[in-house]
Amino acid sequence: MQPDLHCRTLAAHTLKHFRALSPLTHCMTNDVVQTFTANTLLALGASPAMVIDPVEARPFAAIANALLINVGTLTASRADAMRAAVESAYDAKTPWTLDPVAVGALEFRRRFCLDLLSLRPAAIRGNASEILALSGMALGGRGVDTTEAALAALPAAQALARQIDCIVVVTGEIDYVTNGQRTLSIPGGDPLMTRIVGTGCALSAVVAASCALPGAALDNVASACCWMKLAGQAAAERSEGPGSFIPAFLDALYHLDVEAANATN
């Protein structure tokens, strides 16, 4: 099964719908990236909400358009809140996305993530090591860094997508997005995206928000990856290093015009 290059024309069309809907995205993410994640969603036109208390998380997940679960700074109490939110989302048919940060390196989060899979995420986004570990094909990985190339994890991603009946995203120099039957590849971005904390976590939030859109989930999620790659490339051209990259990236998302990018690439 060979990946297909994702069509930027479709990404442009999807972005218009995304901005019109402005999906309310319930982000239960890690402490390190909350502000950057919220700003990324806002810059693209979504509406982020960081509701983390278990008493509030359960009812809020039912009224949100989408839910993100990111286990980067998982604790026992936070796990309880996340589980409550996912159960509520599942009952309300709210699409939820799992970001299994460092799932191959730490047992508590691995067991937690595996337990959540029975509640049917709409999407899973991780690097190669994380997807390999979640699929049961390999354990390891250096936290949020990856020791595997994204393409090497594609068979695991495809198998996981078929098993859970969801979209799986393996990110790297080229992102691969699969539903187990069809796979899309999204090149682009810039190495500077790996030199700041939070671009992967922010992508997971955008993926989660895109799952709230009508239409084919595979195309919507691939479009989300395309937006982030294009903004990263544009920001790198305007910045001198990691410090200036972050504001340039947010500006690039805010002004993103996929159709114009098509004309210049």
Swiss-Prot record:
Cofactor: Mg(2+)
Annotated InterPro entries: Hyethyz_kinase, Ribokinase-like
Residues binding substrate, per UniProt: 50, 198
Protein residues bound to ATP: 125, 171
Catalytic activity entry: 5-(2-hydroxyethyl)-4-methylthiazole + ATP = 4-methyl-5-(2-phosphooxyethyl)-thiazole + ADP + H(+)
UniProt-recorded Gene Ontology molecular function terms: ATP binding; hydroxyethylthiazole kinase activity; magnesium ion binding
Presence of the UniProt keyword Transferase in the record: yes
Pathway(s) of this molecule: Cofactor biosynthesis; thiamine diphosphate biosynthesis; 4-methyl-5-(2-phosphoethyl)-thiazole from 5-(2-hydroxyethyl)-4-methylthiazole: step 1/1
Entry keyword annotation includes Transcription regulation: no
Pfam families per record: HK (PF02110)
GO biological process terms, semicolon-separated: thiamine biosynthetic process; thiamine diphosphate biosynthetic process
EC numbers for this chain: 2.7.1.50
Keywords: ATP-binding, Kinase, Magnesium, Metal-binding, Nucleotide-binding, Thiamine biosynthesis, Transferase
Function: Catalyzes the phosphorylation of the hydroxyl group of 4-methyl-5-beta-hydroxyethylthiazole (THZ).
This protein's name: Hydroxyethylthiazole kinase
UniProt source species: Salmonella typhimurium (strain LT2 / SGSC1412 / ATCC 700720)
